[in-house]
Amino acid sequence: MYSVLKQSIRPRLLATHNQFRTMITAQAVLYTQHGEPKDVLFTQSFEIDDDNLAPNEVIVKTLGSPINPSDINQIQGVYPSKPAKTTGFGTAEPAAPCGNEGLFEVIKVGSNVSSLEAGDWVIPSHVNFGTWRTHALGNDDDFIKLPNPAQSKANGKPNGLTINQGATISVNPLTAYLMLTHYVKLTPGKDWFIQNGGTSAVGKYASQIGKLLNFNSISVIRDRPNLDEVVASLKELGATQVITEDQNNSKEFGPTIKEWIKQSGGEAKLALNCVGGKSSTGIARKLNNNGLMLTYGGMSFQPVTIPTSLYIFKNFTSAGFWVTELLKNNKELKTSTLNQIIAWYEEGKLTDAKSIETLYDGTKPLHELYQDGVANSKDGKQLITY
């Protein structure tokens, strides 16, 4: 897989052997050295010859690309998966592209490409594609097709994907779905999963998907002044029960949870941990025998500590979950999971986690827009649209 960035400003005509060919000016956000995004990012311009595509090549323009914590960690050099550095963008020294998630629209395909055509929406099929850019050039197998709104409408679907849904589809919703379905068989209508980080994007997707699959769920959240309002909103999304971290860690509240599970006739078989520390200990204790806890984050920056007794007497299992590793060599699993998420979006059964959208209009350098987004990430997920 390879990629080249570009930005659609205006095709430029070049005379070559008495013929004219068009070049598309392109831009991308790169870095040559790891560090803080505010210090190391820059915008690189270059051109793509769109009149001389190889048979399997595809040119796409960006519709939107979000800023994820993993993107920031890659730039800092602390994320296990990193994009390769290259001089293919026209830089004097090797540079790496930023961004892992993004939604693109096909604008031109090579003569051998039959799976895609102009106007199709696509996302990268591989990790480390580099999505903080205006356009990209790749092979047809570098992309997975998503239905654009017109195609959804033509297929009789009540809803088409939004740019936010398409641009953010490959991390959080897939993480939630795969954790709920890929490791433990939960009996619909009976069994339970418990998760901390209930107000996080993955937590909200897990609550919704759990309800769609008829799984019972307990979401653990931090206490807050508007607790009743937040609890009501999470239950409306699909959480069966919502408790606070204090209740999660309270021995006195334990019998209440056991009674919920008993009344359903099932078991608590799965825990989803993105916090760590005593929160992870609390949700692990709620599981029945042979339970599994998947850790996919560590927002508290505290280690996961599990009592030895859970391993010995309850045959407890603790494992990590990293969607990138699971899907990097399994395009079929990624595609089938995407198809399920897309179907729920089209049917209006799944609500996406909203992003704070900023339009790139060329008034400031592209990398500054992403630097602003990184700085504003504390206010919510940032999505740069084009």
Swiss-Prot record:
Induction: Up-regulated by growth on oleic acid. Residues 1-22 form a transit peptide. It is found in: Mitochondrion. NADP(+) binds at residues 172, 199-202, 222-224, 296-299, 321-323, 381. Keywords: Fatty acid biosynthesis, Fatty acid metabolism, Lipid biosynthesis, Lipid metabolism, Mitochondrion, NADP, Oxidoreductase, Transit peptide. One of its GO terms (biological process) is fatty acid metabolic process. Pfam families: ADH_N, ADH_zinc_N. GO terms for molecular function: enoyl-[acyl-carrier-protein] reductase (NADPH) activity; trans-2-enoyl-CoA reductase (NADPH) activity. It comes from the Eukaryota. It is an enzyme of class 1 (oxidoreductase). InterPro entries: ADH-like_C (IPR013149), ADH-like_N (IPR013154), GroES-like_sf (IPR011032), Mito_Enoyl-ACP_Reductase (IPR051034), NAD(P)-bd_dom_sf (IPR036291), PKS_ER (IPR020843). GO terms for cellular component: mitochondrion. The active site is at Y79. It catalyses: a 2,3-saturated acyl-[ACP] + NADP(+) = a (2E)-enoyl-[ACP] + NADPH + H(+). Its EC number is 1.3.1.104. Homodimer and heterodimer with ETR1. Required for respiration and the maintenance of the mitochondrial compartment. Oxidoreductase with a preference for short and medium chain substrates, including trans-2-hexenoyl-CoA (C6), trans-2-decenoyl-CoA (C10), and trans-2-hexadecenoyl-CoA (C16). May play a role in mitochondrial fatty acid synthesis. Belongs to the zinc-containing alcohol dehydrogenase family. Quinone oxidoreductase subfamily. PANTHER family: ENOYL-[ACYL-CARRIER-PROTEIN] REDUCTASE, MITOCHONDRIAL. This is Enoyl-[acyl-carrier-protein] reductase 2, mitochondrial. It comes from Candida tropicalis (Yeast). The gene is ETR2.
